[in-house]
Structures are given as structure tokens and as C-alpha cells.
């Protein structure tokens, strides 16, 4: 089940948003932010205000996902419904690594093994829009705990080292214009 679509349906189609808010003036922005928070790529036809709130919610969701993944991995919970047997020795598929090298999100349909899903979790970092989001992800420490995992598979460990370098490089790239400047007229 697509939890974002269901959340938007429950709140707006079933009317439960009124359990939380009496005023409907922001319904279109809130609905879009909920509906789009888990998509691979945001819709093109968003208004600047919708895009802002979608990006904020998406960043917050990714930061929370890092926490959840650390918790589940420490408890050996099978969050990705893949084979955990000997996961420290599993390979990282070429298609997943190609997306990581591009600093992109990994498409769900390309993930097959635990290590593919793990790399997909690391690549969420590349999709964080705002500098403060990256800062929070690092300050909270969950993303760093994910980065600290080491594989016993020599090829996978080389690829993980490459991803760690890509993360460091992403932190030194020029950041986009800050939110206050970008959306000051909204």
C-alpha cells in the first residue's frame, strides 16, 4: 500500500483533516505535501508554495527514515523483505551502484538484495534539498551510523567507500539559494 496516497485519501477524501484543522485555506498545499512525500520525483506542475512544502516534508521524512533504519537494523528487523542471510557478504548490484555514483535516489524496482536496499537508504542523503536538512541528518547521528556499516564482501566494501566519498563531496558542493530568499514573496 502506498502510505502517502492513503494518508492523503484518509485526511482529505474521508474528511479527517478537519479533526486537526478547521481552516481549509492550506488544504491544497498540505494534501500535495503528504501525497508527494514518498515519490521518486516530484510532479513538475507544482506551484512554488506546494514545491516548498513538498521538499520540506520529503527532507523531514528522509531524516526520520535514517533513524528508523538504524533502529530496525540494530534489532535485525527485516524492513525490506529481502534475504538477510549473510548480508555482510552480499554484493551491491551494478544498476544500484550506477545510480549511487550519479548522486541519485535508487529506484525501488532496481533493489534486489539487502545491500541494494541499504545503498538505497544511503542515497536518500543525496536527495535532501536544504542545507539544514543535511546538517540535521549529520547532527542526529543516525545517517553516520548507517555510513559506518562495513561489508565483508571486498567489492561491496569498495563501493561503500566510494559512496562515503560521494557523501563527503556532496557536503562541499555549493548549496542552493536558501529558502527564505527563494520563497520570500509567497
Q: What does each of the following model-derived ranges do?
A:
Residues 9, 32-35, 55-58:
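Generic alpha-helical structural context detector
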Residues 16-18, 39-186:
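Divalent metal-dependent phosphate-bond-processing catalytic cores, especially two-metal-ion Mg2+/Mn2+ enzymes
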Residues 2-16:
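An active-site-proximal "capping" alpha-helix that borders the catalytic cofactor pocket
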Residues 1-6, 24, 53:
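Active-site metal-coordination segments of metallo-dependent hydrolases
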Residues 24-38:
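Short, well-structured alpha-helical segments
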Amino acid at each position: 500500500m502506498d502510505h502517502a496516497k492513503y494518508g492523503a485519501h484518509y485526511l482529505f477524501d474521508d474528511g479527517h483533516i478537519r479533526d486537526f484543522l478547521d481552516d481549509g485555506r492550506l488544504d491544497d498545499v498540505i494534501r500535495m505535501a503528504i501525497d508527494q512525500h514518498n515519490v521518486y520525483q516530484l510532479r513538475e506542475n507544482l506551484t512554488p508554495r506546494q514545491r516548498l512544502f513538498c521538499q520540506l516534508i520529503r527532507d523531514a521524512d528522509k531524516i526520520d527514515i535514517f533513524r528508523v533504519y538504524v533502529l530496525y537494523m540494530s534489532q535485525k528487523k527485516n524492513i525490506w523483505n529481502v534475504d538477510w542471510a549473510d548480508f555482510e557478504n552480499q554484493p551491491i548490484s551494478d544498476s544500484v551502484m550506477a545510480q549511487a555514483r550519479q548522486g541519485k535516489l535508487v529506484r525501488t524496482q532496481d533493489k534486489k538484495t539487502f545491500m541494494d536496499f541499504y545503498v538505497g537508504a544511503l542515497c536518500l542523503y543525496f536527495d535532501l534539498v536544504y542545507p539544514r536538512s543535511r546538517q540535521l541528518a549529520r547532527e542526529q547521528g543516525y545517517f553516520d551510523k548507517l555510513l559506518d556499516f562495513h561489508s565483508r564482501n571486498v567489492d561491496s566494501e569498495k563501493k561503500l567507500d566510494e559512496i562515503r566519498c560521494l557523501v563527503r563531496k556532496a557536503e562541499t558542493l555549493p548549496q542552493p539559494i536558501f529558502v527564505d530568499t527563494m520563497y520570500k514573496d509567497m
